[in-house]
Amino acid sequence: GENTMGSNEAGVRTNADLSMLSAFLCRYDRHEPRLALMAEKTLRYAVHTHKAVRRKACKDGRYWGSTSVADHQWESSLWAMSVAYSAFFQWERLDSLMRDDVYRLLKAECDYELERDIPTGYIGDTKAEENGWEVDVLAAALGLFPDDALAPRWFQRMREFAVNSYSHPSDADNHTIPDPWYDNSTISSMYRGANLYPDWTLQNHDFFHTSYQNVVIQELGEAALALRLFQGDRQKWKSETLLHNCDSVTQNVLNWLTLPDGEQAMPNGNDWSLFLYDQVTSYSTMACMRGDADALLFEQQALRKIARRQQTTPDGAWLLRPDVGARRMGVQGHRVMMTWLMHHIFPVGGMQPADVKDFMLRHAEARILPCQNIVRTMTGDYFAC
């Protein structure tokens, strides 16, 4: 790995994803002793090295995570979400002390979410992705501990972060009540500011970035999945805010950049490895939770490409020469795992994928994304932007 057992993203995220994937395979595929031991040891390390638990320091002598506005770490909620999934998959095998430590970790991360401001901004550095992963940890805590005294506050904060993930200027005047079963809060009352341009595009890393344009769908979908999966037969918490504006972003931007093989065009380039197909879980979210036949088509296309690419590596790695080493392996495994779970929990039933020629015909006209100075067109012979 880049920084095995370290306290930064390269160390913590990689370990958390490894733990989650190992535990997932034990629960849904085969319970092999070595795999179960890996799931348990990596979970223990992730939990014990968190700032709220402190039973063991990372190899650099530090602890990871967020506990308050005064002591927080960028992106720690994303890693904590993977820890929560790992804990859920092996919950029956955890002793009471480990369960308590998992609670302390998630409560600390959520304490930070309750204290902090909800950021917004769309020029160069959208906060859409970051707010999306804050939704994830709040949903995970609600799912695992639905009767906690803080659960109503976690729920409200989760909804606010969800509305302000793909937040659009039109939300300021959106008086829809998303959860009338719970209260009369409107979209406009939870809106803090725009993370999208008026044409539904966004910028991250200082340019129009297709990877970040789609990843919020995946994050919000994983939050909805955690709520449904973790709560089991007793669904106390649910919210229509969790896929807020995902349809509009898909229809106004992403569909116009989606290629027949499931890849998405990147008019301004990409600063990660090319041909990752890591938008696969965004497709799964739209197919399984929104009944989107186009998304089902491109999810299947992307999965075929992912499988073919894996066959080119001698050891079964997801891709050759990954940009961020073992961390990329964890992220890619994370995506494929979530895609499987989406279909397991939200099956598409008899829905058939759209026909690719029909999709191309519906998206054949030239399209302008004015806020990014992008023009695209597609014919049966070429795609250009």
Question: Which role does the model predict for each range below?
Answer:
Residues 1-2:
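Long compositionally biased, domain-poor regions of proteins
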Residues 7-282:
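Aromatic-lined, polymer-binding surfaces characteristic
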Residues 216, 229-235, 239, 259-385:
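Extended polysaccharide-engagement surfaces of secreted carbohydrate-active enzymes
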